[in-house]
């Protein structure tokens, strides 16, 4: 998940990872459907649909649910959501097979709309908000130069984790990615 209005901001990690995959695997945009841009291609020998909800971040569940229903995607076995996580250090990624929203309103809406917490997610660390900052100001801010390199690497690692999930399975991707330190 992300927002076209937050390009290169910490709240846009999902979109940045999708852009990385689009470029790396030459996946063309197929169009706009259900308030989401999407493209179809092949990654790790598997057919994929990459999508970017065009809704507000906190309403990402609608486009995800509608796209999953239309393309007959089983959220519990065929969906991967990539998003920012303030509980992880900048540059760190963490893959989980299920779990709560952890305070992320976009994920909360996806869980609500899908009716399950059981879907694969790749969290990209953006770091905790600085003391005295509003959370919204933090996630909508640009990265410090010192963190930008780490975050760019994490975006690539998140994209590469998608390929590993598709070619070797989620456990292999989790074993490799969850143990990496930025």
Summary of predicted features, one role per range:
Residues 11-29:
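Short catalytic helix/loop segments, enriched in acidic residues and glycine
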Residues 23-77, 81-82:
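Conserved N-terminal catalytic core of the sugar/cofactor nucleotidyltransferase
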Residues 64-112:
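Conserved beta-loop-beta/alpha segment of the NTase-like Rossmann-fold superfamily
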Residues 1-7:
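Short, small-residue-biased leader/transition segments that mark boundaries at the very start
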Residues 91-182:
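Phosphate-binding/catalytic loops
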Residues 3, 55-56, 85-88, 171:
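Short glycine-rich anion-binding loops that position phosphate/pyrophosphate groups of nucleotides
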């Amino acid at each position: 998940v992300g927002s076209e209005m937050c390009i290169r901001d910490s709240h846009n990690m999902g979109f940045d990872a999708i852009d990385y995959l689009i470029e790396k695997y030459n996946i063309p945009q197929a169009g706009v459907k259900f308030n989401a841009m999407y493209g179809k291609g092949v990654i790790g020998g598997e057919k994929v649909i990459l999508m970017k909800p065009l809704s507000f971040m906190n309403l990402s569940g609608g486009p995800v649910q509608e796209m999953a229903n239309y393309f007959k995607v089983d959220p519990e076995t065929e969906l991967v959501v990539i998003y920012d996580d303030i509980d992880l250090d900048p540059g760190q990624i963490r893959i989980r097979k299920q779990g709560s929203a952890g305070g992320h309103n976009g994920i909360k809406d996806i869980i609500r709309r899908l009716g399950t917490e059981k879907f694969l997610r790749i969290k990209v660390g953006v770091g905790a908000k600085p003391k005295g900052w509003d959370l919204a100001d933090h996630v909508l801010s640009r990265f410090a130069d010192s963190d930008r390199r780490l975050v760019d690497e994490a975006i690539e690692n998140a994209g590469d984790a998608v390929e590993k999930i598709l070619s070797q399975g989620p456990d292999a991707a989790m074993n490799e990615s969850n143990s990496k330190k930025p």
